[in-house]
Curated annotation (Swiss-Prot):
GO CC, any one term: membrane
Residues annotated as catalytic: D821 (proton acceptor)
E.C. designation(s): 2.7.11.1
Organism annotation: Glycine max (Soybean)
SUPFAM superfamilies documented for this protein: L domain-like, Protein kinase-like (PK-like), RNI-like
Distribution of this protein across tissues and organs: Expressed in roots, leaves, vegetative shoot apex, and reproductive floral apex.
Family: Belongs to the protein kinase superfamily. Ser/Thr protein kinase family.
Amino acids binding ATP: I702, G703, K704, G705, G706, A707, G708, I709, V710, K724
Primary role: LRR receptor kinase involved in the regulation of root and shoot growth, and root nodule organogenesis. Involved in long distance nodulation signaling events. Involved in the autoregulation of nodulation (AON), a long distance systemic signaling from root to shoot and back again, which allows legumes to limit the number of root nodules formed based on available nitrogen and previous rhizobial colonization. Acts from shoot to root to control AON.
Phenotypic consequence of gene deletion: Dramatic increase in root nodule number when inoculated with symbiotic rhizobia.
Protein name (record): Leucine-rich repeat receptor-like kinase protein CLV1B
């Protein structure tokens, strides 16, 4: 009887448990489905979390992608990173009270964190990084999560002070709060974490002193506090007691003072990053006690003295970065003996004497950069002994002798920069065949001999051999350099004709072959090289005429053929070259009259001086200088009249024939139009493909540029659209992902992004359809007749709006989108003068996609290109930031980025030069010296504030520039003084 009762009791308990488990299981499924609906948002793809569907099964939800359950079918883990999702976290997340791991990283989730998160008391791992969560971080919500070990909120939009409640989480080991907008100082209480091993607070807006009490974190192994924080004072010497530290990063955070010798006690440290600060004094020799050290970066400070000899004990060192300091003396011989050294960067110091001849003999050297020092002697022969060396950077020194032959056999090399030395001899021919080299710069040396007839560097983007003693003919084999963008052969002794093959290179942008002994005509292939932005063929003995079709070079900014023997009339078509800002045809044999109108209004008479038979509108006599006029006089009046009659008859007949053919072709075109063109819409459009194509007429053209020709199209329903006909981007079988990428761009929706409505395509052409912007581009307003009407308040507003558009591309798109061609002409204004960023993501499609599948090397427009592009041939978000900084300078100064400051000087260089010329330099004095004279009644503090942001954006080093998110934050929240109008300037 007793056993029967026990059995019944157990059965009853089992059914109770089963009912509870069933209810909990179905509750979890219901919560997951609500979670899906909220997290997807309106922009997510239809297949996002597609398998999260209701199914009448207790365990169905446990098979959802990214979901893990325990034995009781309760959800214990969710990982939905990289979906992407565009919604928010709903309150229902709190119902999943058995969750131990919640990972929603790499999405576009927005809003504030729901207070219901506090119910997740079992949570051990919370990762919400790489989203757009905002507001103050709710530390009180996290406080009940007493089991939490990992908290990662990197790259969001959290503001306010750092959450102090987190110190009560006794099991917390990993805390990553970087990449937000936290402000204020680091709380002293952060020294009270019990178990913390990883702490990263970098890339915020923190200030104050770094608390020395952080040294009490005895379990800490990783500490990162730098990057765009701005602390007061220096490195706390107490940090030397943190014996468990393996990684210490205090870079780019305004630290001053000397490096504490007490850091030598960190014997377990393998990484020490102190770069981009204001540290002074010498490098402490005591740091040699850090025998575990592998990476040491002290670059971009004000350190003095020599490299300590005691550093010979750092046998594990792989990276030694000391560049941009004031270090002096010689490089000790032990540096060449460090067995693991891979990176040695000492550039921009005061080092001197001969480099250790044993450099590279360790067999691991990859990156070697000693640019801008005072080194003498020979280039070490064994730099590439390992076959791993990627960069040789020795520009601006006093090296002599030849380049070692071993360098010509170093197939791992990607960059050779050896300009401005005293090197001589014949350059090893193997250098011009290295498969991976992207840059060869040998300018301003004493090299001689001929270039090898065989050249085949398939990756070479920059070839600079200027100001040497090279002789012989320019080899046609240059045509093999399909990635070449810059070719500088000026100031040598080359002879013969310019090989036409040079201008068949699909990516060529800059050509300088001036100052040689070249003869013959300018190759006609020049007019096909539509990527060109600068051409200098001056100081040669070229003859013939400027080739017809020069107007095809729509991106050309500089064209110099002065001091040659070129003849014929000045081409009329130059008037249509709107990008051309510098033209020099002086000292040639041009004849006739200089055309007027169009772009000719930009050029002065100096551009045409030294041509005896050429006159301008001010210097021409009444009689024409054209030879045809003299011929007409010799024919007499009767002959001239007869000729005119014949010409008129022929013209009328030809016109009638053309009209008939045109009518026939138009009818035929309309019949076939719908069959040859296809419209792909990204939203509801009330027009057809043939309506778009009908607008491709000369009279509808509203712009031409590197991205193609832009037409204004009026659709039958009354809608106006902008139609961009892309250059060199076909849509046939070999479109190299064009359709996929354009469709991705078509899904982008932001108030300050020019909306892509759809595209029309056939086998040869792609037409992109955008919303029409009636007020044109910012460039037109700044540099055209309208500039005087663009008041300061409007300029500032446009800057904020454009920054928000770029910020969206960089931080809110997944994957992020690099614009690649930020400029004032790509910031368009709608009817309310609201800014819209245009042409984003198009730069990679501007060249023939069949020529190369490597499109990432297209950098942007002349004057906007970041300086590091010359070294890397790559662009990233910080390249866009630099270009945006140039746009900010345009808004302040009102001048184009190039062409108005003298040869070789752009707007950034001019501003820096102006600063140096001021008797009493200050921000106010500099702004008053450069500000647009058309501005009046502007608040000086506001202009200074935006000017300082612009100068942050155009810093020479990419890592030192702010992100676009930081730019938006700064522009949107100026200090109180910058918004006041008490300091108005009237000019």
């Amino acid at each position: 009887m007793r056993s029967c009762v026990c059995y019944t009791l157990l059965l009853f308990i089992f059914f109770i448990w089963l009912r509870v488990a069933t209810c909990s299981s179905f509750t979890d499924m219901e919560s997951l489905l609500k979670l899906k609906d909220s997290m997807k948002g309106d922009k997510a793809k239809d297949d996002a979390l597609h398998d999260w569907k209701f199914f009448p099964s207790l365990s169905a939800h446990c098979f959802f992608s990214g979901v893990k359950c325990d034995r009781e079918l309760r959800v214990v883990a969710i990982n939905v990173s990289f979906v992407p999702l565009f919604g928010h976290l709903p309150p229902e997340i709190g119902q999943l009270d058995k969750l131990e791991n919640l990972t929603v990283s790499q999405n576009n989730l927005t809003g504030v964190l729901p207070k219901e998160l506090a119910a997740l008391t079992s949570l051990k791992h919370l990762n919400i990084s790489h989203n757009v969560f905002s507001g103050h971080f709710p530390g009180q919500i996290i406080l009940p999560m007493t089991k939490l070990e990992v908290l990662d909120v990197y790259d969001n939009n959290f503001t306010g002070p750092l959450p102090v409640e987190l110190v009560k989480l006794e099991k917390l080991k990993y805390l990553k709060l970087d990449g937000n907008y936290f402000s204020g100082s680091i709380p002293e209480s952060y020294s009270e974490f019990k178990s913390l091993e990883f702490l990263s607070l970098s890339t915020n807006s923190l200030s104050g002193k770094i608390p020395k009490s952080l040294s009490k974190l005895k379990t800490l192994r990783y500490l990162k506090l730098g990057y765009n924080n701005a602390y007061e004072g220096g490195i706390p010497p107490e940090f030397g007691s943190m014996k468990s530290l393996r990684y210490l990063d205090l870079s780019s955070c305004n630290l001053s003072g000397e490096i504490p010798p007490s850091l030598a006690n960190l014997t377990n440290l393998d990484t020490l990053f102190l770069q981009i600060n204001n540290l002074t004094g010498t490098i402490p020799s005591e740091l040699s006690a850090m025998v575990s050290l592998m990476s040491l970066d002290l670059s971009i400070n004000d350190l003095t003295g020599e490299i300590p000899m005691s550093f010979s004990q750092l046998r594990n060192l792989t990276l030694m970065n000391f560049f941009q300091n004031n270090l002096r003396g010689s490089v000790p011989s032990f540096v060449g003996e460090l067995p693991n050294l891979e990176t040695l960067q000492l550039w921009d110091n005061n080092f001197s004497f001969v480099l250790p001849p044993n450099l590279g003999q360790n067999g691991k050297l990859k990156f070697f950069d000693v640019i801008k020092n005072h080194f003498t002697g020979l280039i070490p022969r064994d730099l590439c002994k390992s076959g791993r060396l990627q960069t040789i950077m020795i520009t601006d020194n006093f090296f002599r002798g030849p380049i070692p032959n071993e360098i010509g056999n170093c197939k791992s090399l990607t960059k050779i920069r050896a300009s401005n030395n005293y090197l001589n001899g014949v350059v090893p021919s193997g250098i011009f065949k290295l498969p991976s080299v992207t840059i060869i710069e040998l300018a301003n040396n004493r090299f001689n001999g001929e270039l090898p007839p065989e050249i085949s560097g398939e990756s070479l983007g920059i070839l600079t051999l200027s100001n040497n003693l090279f002789s012989g003919k320019i080899p046609p084999a240059l045509k093999n350099l399909r990635a070449l963008q810059t070719l500088s052969l000026d100031a040598n002794e080359f002879v013969g004709e310019i090989p036409g093959e040079v201008f068949d290179l699909p990516m060529l942008t800059v050509v300088n072959i001036s100052g040689n002994n070249l003869t013959g005509p300018i190759p006609t292939t020049l007019t096909r090289c539509v990527s060109l932005t600068a051409v200098d063929l001056s100081r040669n003995m070229l003859e013939g005429k400027i080739p017809k079709g020069i107007k095809n070079l729509t991106d050309l900014s500089i064209f110099n053929v002065s001091i040659n023997q070129i003849s014929g009339p000045v081409p009329e078509e130059i008037r249509f070259m709107l990008s051309l800002t510098t033209l020099d045809l002086s000292n040639n044999n041009f004849i006739g009259k200089v055309p007027t109108g169009g772009q000719f209004a930009v050029f002065s008479e100096k551009s045409f001086a030294g041509n005896p038979n050429l006159c301008t509108s001010h210097s021409c006599p009444n009689s024409s200088l054209y030879p045809d006029d003299a011929l007409k006089k010799r024919r007499g009046p009767w002959s001239l009249k007869s000729t005119r009659v014949i010409v008129i008859v022929i013209a009328l007949g030809t016109a009638a024939l053309l009209v008939a053919v045109t009518v026939y072709m138009m009818r035929r075109r309309k019949m076939n139009l719908a069959k040859t063109w296809k419209l792909t819409a990204f939203q509801r459009l009330n027009f057809k493909a043939e309506d778009v194509v009908e607008c491709l007429k000369e009279e509808n053209i509203i712009g031409k540029g590197g991205a193609g020709i832009v037409y204004r199209g009026s659709m039958p329903n009354g809608t106006d659209v902008a139609i961009k006909r892309l250059v060199g981007a076909g849509s046939g079988r070999n479109d190299y992902g064009f359709k996929a990428e354009i469709e991705t761009l078509g899904k982008i929706r932001h108030r300050n992004i020019m909306r892509l409505l759809g595209y029309v395509s056939n086998k040869e052409t792609n037409l992109l359809l955008y919303e029409y912007m009636p007020n044109g581009s910012l460039g037109e307003w700044l540099h055209g007749a309208k500039g005087g009407h663009l008041k300061w308040e409007m300029r500032y507003k446009i800057a904020v709006e454009a920054a928000k558009g770029l910020c969206y591309l960089h931080h809110d798109c997944s994957p992020l989108i690099i614009h690649r061609d930020v400029k004032s002409n790509n910031i368009l204004l709608d009817g309310d003068l609201e800014a819209h960023v245009a042409d984003f993501g198009l730069a990679k499609f501007l060249y023939d996609p069949g020529a190369s599948q490597s499109m990432s090397s297209i950098a942007g427009s002349y004057g906007y290109i970041a300086p590091e592009y010359a070294y890397t041939l790559k662009v990233d978000e910080k390249s866009d930031v630099y270009s945006f900084g140039v746009v900010l300078l345009e808004l302040i100064i009102g001048r184009k980025p190039v062409g108005e400051f003298g040869d070789g000087v752009d707007i950034v260089g001019w501003v820096n030069k102006t600063r140096l010329e001021l008797a009493q330099p200050s921000d106010a004095a500099l702004v008053l010296a450069v500000v647009d004279p058309r501005l009046s009644g502007y608040p000086l503090t506001s202009v200074i504030y935006m000017f300082n942001i612009a100068m942050m954006c155009v810093k020479e080093m990419g890592p030192a520039r702010p992100t676009m998110r930081e730019v938006v934050h700064m522009l949107s929240e100026p200090p109180h003084s910058a918004t006041h109008t008490h300091n108005l300037i009237n000019l």
